[in-house]
C-alpha cells in the first residue's frame, strides 16, 4: 500500500 502509515 502507498498511503498506509497507520491511519485508516
Curated annotation (Swiss-Prot):
Domain of life: Eukaryota
GO molecular function, one term: sodium channel regulator activity
Gene Ontology terms: cellular component: extracellular region
UniProt signal peptide: none
Tissue: Expressed by the venom gland.
Main localization category: secreted
Alphabetical keyword list: Ion channel impairing toxin, Secreted, Toxin, Voltage-gated sodium channel impairing toxin
Subcellular localization, as worded in the UniProt entry: Secreted
Record flagged with keyword Secreted: yes
Protein family according to the UniProt entry: Belongs to the non-disulfide-bridged peptide (NDBP) superfamily. Short antimicrobial peptide (group 4) family.
Note: Negative results: has no effect on voltage-gated potassium channels. Has no effect on voltage-gated sodium channels Nav1.2/SCN2A, Nav1.3/SCN3A, Nav1.4/SCN4A and a sodium channel from B.germanica.
The protein, known as: Venom peptide 7.1
Amino acid at each position: 500500500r502507498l498511503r498506509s502509515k497507520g491511519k485508516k
